[in-house]
């Protein structure tokens, strides 16, 4: 049985505020590179998974760009340990049981509501930001397969650079996936290309 997402009237607003606060406190600057054209659709945010910060960064993007009700998939063991995330939009996945099918169905159901966004890390684990050969797990394809309603798929690449600052600068590269094909190979290839483009663009910055 999966733990479904909740949005507590105290914890959820605090988490939204805290995400912005802690990011500003621990970074020298924050830049969002790219555009998001709101099509009034549910949003699936596909992000690289490079650190403990990723969930806070995605919330920052949601607050400043997407403006949806925040949902994210989290390992059941971790969600039970850090229970408060369940009240900020977190829902559980357990890859070792049949409940993973229920989680994928639940995720797909969330993406029928235009007020919702769902964050997923298709890598399935934290990896180095220098790894540009990202392998997606098959759950992503199952979520999008045969959906009757349209979904706006948005790519997010999180990168950091210090330059001459003691604190890192955070750079969020975003782009909508518009190729149309929701098969795993197409999405993975397009995301990998976008990741490489983002790194190339990052190399032109000096602060």
Q: Where do the protein language model's features map onto the residues?
A:
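Non-catalytic C-terminal accessory region of glycerolipid acyltransferases
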Residues: 2-3, 104-207
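Alpha-helical membrane-targeting segments
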Residues: 1-27, 80-88
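Catalytic core of membrane glycerolipid acyltransferases/transacylases, capturing the structured
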Residues: 39-97
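Soluble or luminal CAZymes and related metallo-dependent hydrolases
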Residues: 10, 14-15, 98-103, 136
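Short, flexible loop segments at the rims of nucleotide/cofactor-binding pockets, characterized by
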Residues: 20-26, 94-99, 130-132
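Helix-to-loop junction immediately C-terminal to a conserved catalytic motif
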Residues: 12-13, 17-49
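Short amphipathic alpha-helical face segments that pack within enzyme cores
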Residues: 23, 54-57, 139-143
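Glycine-rich, highly charged phosphate/nucleotide-binding loops
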Residues: 26-31, 98-106
């Amino acid at each position: 049985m999966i733990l479904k997402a909740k949005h507590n009237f105290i914890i959820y607003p605090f988490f939204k505020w805290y995400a912005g606060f802690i990011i500003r406190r621990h970074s020298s600057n924050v830049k969002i590179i790219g555009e998001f054209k709101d099509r009034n659709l549910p949003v699936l945010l596909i992000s690289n998974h490079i650190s403990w910060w990723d969930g806070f960064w995605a919330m920052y993007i949601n607050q400043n760009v997407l403006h949806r009700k925040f949902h994210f998939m989290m390992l059941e063991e971790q969600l039970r340990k850090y229970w408060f995330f369940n009240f900020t939009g977190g829902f559980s996945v357990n890859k070792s049981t049949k409940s993973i099918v229920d989680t994928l169905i639940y995720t797909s159901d969330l993406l029928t509501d235009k007020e919702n966004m769902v964050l997923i890390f298709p890598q399935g684990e934290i990896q180095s930001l220098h790894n540009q050969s990202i392998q997606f797990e098959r759950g992503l394809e199952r979520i999008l397969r045969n959906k009757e309603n349209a979904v706006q798929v948005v790519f997010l690449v999180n990168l950091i650079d210090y330059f001459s600052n003691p604190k890192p600068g955070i750079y969020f590269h975003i782009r909508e996936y518009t190729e149309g094909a929701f098969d795993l190979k197409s999405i993975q290839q397009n995301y990998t290309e976008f990741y490489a483009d983002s790194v190339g663009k990052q190399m032109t910055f000096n602060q």
